[in-house]
Amino acid sequence: MNHKITLGLLAVLMALALVFTGCAGGEEPTEPATEPTTEPITEAATEAPTDPPTEAPTEPPTEPQPTNPLTGEVVEAEMTGRFFCVSINNVKPALPHRGVVNADMYFEMFINDYCTRGLAMYADIENAGSIGSIRSLRYNFTDIAQGYDAIVVHAGGSDSVMSDLRSSGVNNLNGNNMGGFYRDSGRKASGYATEHTLFAYGEDLLAEAAKRGYRTTLDTEKDFGLTFTADGTPAGGETANTVNIDLIHKGYSKVSTMVYDSDLGGYTYQQYGKTMVDDTTGGKECFENVIVIVTVVENKVASGNTYHVAELEGSGSGYFACGGKIISINWKRSGPNAPFSFTHTDGTPLELGVGSSYIAIAPTASQITWQ
């Protein structure tokens, strides 16, 4: 009986062993633990932000520099003074001139007795210095002054000329009965005739004009008819280092010669066999531009005198020299209150060289030659 128990117990033990063996030694292999893998999260592709396009920096527009309306020269401040025209003695016994070297424009023309006289125009009379010698008024001087809204300066005039002046309404300063003028005693002592001794300082003329209640400010709305360029040498012009201006009227002749001086950059003024120099400074009278206005000149008998009066309204032909070259041009003046304007023969505007101008009023019989 004990034997049976033993066998039964053995069977139980063997069964248990099989169970435990299956549990203890039979772990199924497992894959090692791994961290979960993640794909990188990417945002939708976007373009990098860009700055809006910017325009290239631009320089602010520069204000045009103020210029002298009669010469085109750059000046420090806007010119606001009214122009002055001065009647200049030009007969040989009256020379040398004073102050013509400072004129912006200088007109020469027959006036009476087949002699010429000058009309010097200044945009800045206050700084013109001593001017003269000053002589009496002539018809065309009033005419030109009116066209440029200028105050005309003179030493009297005949009854007919003074009547014409009053009719024109042009403001004037008369050295015979107004202040601002002086007689040069040194000239008188050295033998000059009295009529060749009257002078005035520009600043004194300005003061006298103000004293008399004349408007002394420039009409800034007025077009003075001139355009300028740094180099006014005319394209296609003929060589003209010397321009000989033989003013001829009724068989009488007066010659002015303009000689180009490259060092001075303009034409020196020669007459009576001499180069004109300033009586105060000794400097040569020199002009960047030489203009010849060809027109009809008539004799007019008035107050017992014979005057030479040029037709300065309308249009006509002429010449222009600058930089050693010369061309034919046209001139125009539309009325008594208008200045001169100049064009090429094809009608395009003429550009003058920056600087002063000598202008000859030439009767139609005149001879203009150059070389």
What are these regions (language model features)?
Residues A24-E27:
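Bacterial signal peptide processing site
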Residues M1-L9:
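Bacterial N-terminal signal peptides that target proteins for export
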Residues E63-F107, N112-Q371:
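A surface/extracellular/periplasmic glyco- and lipid-processing/surface-interacting theme
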Residues P29-T62, T67:
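Intrinsically disordered, low-complexity serine/threonine-rich repeat tracts
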